[in-house]
Amino acid sequence: MSEVRRPERSGGPDRPIGDLHPDYPLPDVDHPVTRPFWDGCRERRLRVQRDRETGSFHWPPKPSTWKGGRLEWVDAKGTGTVYTWVLGREPFLPAFKDLLPLAMVVVELDEGPRLVGHMVGCTPDEVAIGRRVRVVFKPLTERVVLPVWELVR
């Protein structure tokens, strides 16, 4: 398991953009299994793995040797529906206190896989199972860009 990284307080590619809390946990964008996903996010592209033989999509990412190396990274449309959601009212980490209330969602992509994220640009009253959403990208540092979700209006 990777060590939790935190934003750098001075200089470097992991210095926060905006007012990111200094204890905000950052994903390991250099992990060999997930690096293509994070590279895609930096390029504002939502990437998932697809089996070259069956055409089925896979999430979470698998090692490149899984299924004999048949998986390839492809761009998803970036749209889907809210499969389920929960409203966070208590900060499970101090870094998330200023984000509350936070609508956390599981989005079923049009391609099939389900990704976890949170909603932006709407009130919790507007979030509902079955609502159409699209991905938008939220830069946390120069290297870490998160996929988050907004309602399709």
Question: Which stretches of residues belong to each language-model region?
Answer:
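Short, conserved secondary-structure segments in the cores of folded domains
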Residues: E72-W73, V105, T123-D125
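A short, acidic/glycine-rich surface segment
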Residues: W66-G68, R89-P94
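Cys/His-rich short segments
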Residues: C41-T79
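Residue-level recognition of beta-strand microenvironments
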Residues: F57, T79-T81, W85, C122
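A broadly conserved sequence feature marking short terminus-proximal activation segments
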Residues: S2-L46, L151
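Well-ordered alpha/beta subsegment
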Residues: G112, G117-R153
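Short, conserved beta-turn/loop elements at beta-strand boundaries and strand-helix junctions
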Residues: W85-P91, L140
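Short, basic/aromatic beta-hairpin or loop at an interaction surface
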Residues: L99-L115
